[in-house]
Swiss-Prot record:
Name of the protein described by the UniProt record: Lipoprotein-releasing system ATP-binding protein LolD 1
Gene3D superfamilies per record: P-loop containing nucleotide triphosphate hydrolases
Record carries keyword Repeat: no
Similarity field: Belongs to the ABC transporter superfamily. Lipoprotein translocase (TC 3.A.1.125) family.
Keyword S-adenosyl-L-methionine: no
Keyword vocabulary terms for this entry: ATP-binding, Cell inner membrane, Cell membrane, Membrane, Nucleotide-binding, Translocase, Transport
Spans through the membrane: none
PROSITE patterns documented for this protein: ABC_TRANSPORTER_1, ABC_TRANSPORTER_2, LOLD
Amino acid sequence: MTNVIEARGIEKVFHNGDEETRVLKGIDLTLGQGELAAMVGASGSGKSTLLSIIGLLLRPTAGTLSISGERVDDLSERMRARFRNQRLGFVFQFHHLLPDFTAMENVAFPAAAPGGGISRAMRTRARDLLARVGLEDRIDFPAARLSGGQKQRVAIARALMNRPDLIIADEPTGNLDRESADRVLDLMREVNREEGATFLICTHDDGVAARCGRRLTLSDGRLTSNVRDPGGFS
Ligand code: ADP
Ligand code: MG
């Protein structure tokens, strides 16, 4: 089976004037299809930087990256953007929904061709996904009128719209109270189990990490631990 992520020797150095910050110092990471993995680490340890590199939003200073068996680190910007839109899904701490558009439109829009409308098939899939995340009664609500947890459910439905190979979630529960955070994580577990979606979730919440199938720890620019079934019950 092809691995969804194969990263080898990933390094990242940021330059600000004369100052150099070495954030990632050689990351090797393999993630198989259907995994639900959490990455934990102190604030500033480089979690978002690594997710941005894997999400093709940022290029590594060194190292190689393959997603679903395809080398992506040396692609042109245009091909990287295309790969990102077609093969990856994103969930961020701040959902970035369009407040005046409905839940359905927020899920379907990113899948529409630039300048194109939402096709009937996209509408149907967006509605199905919103039902899947428990929002069948909020499909036509403007995003601004949804609660924080509901908005994050819309963001998950949106991430699933293109049937991505990998869903990258950066602190998806960071802005939610305990109960909403648990429900959002339950939903990701369900989508993982029932649809085989592969997740890489970065979180500073140990409660979230304990309920993922694998916990990776990032410390001082290196992956220092890799524990399968950290909660001991999946
Ligand atoms: P985390 O998500 O684990 O909190 P980040 O990946 O956001 O950590 O940041 C890791 C380190 O890299 C921090 O010291 C941060 O200041 C630095 N950093 C992140 N992005 C940039 C940037 N664009 N330019 C310079 N330094 C950056
Ligand atoms: Mg971060």
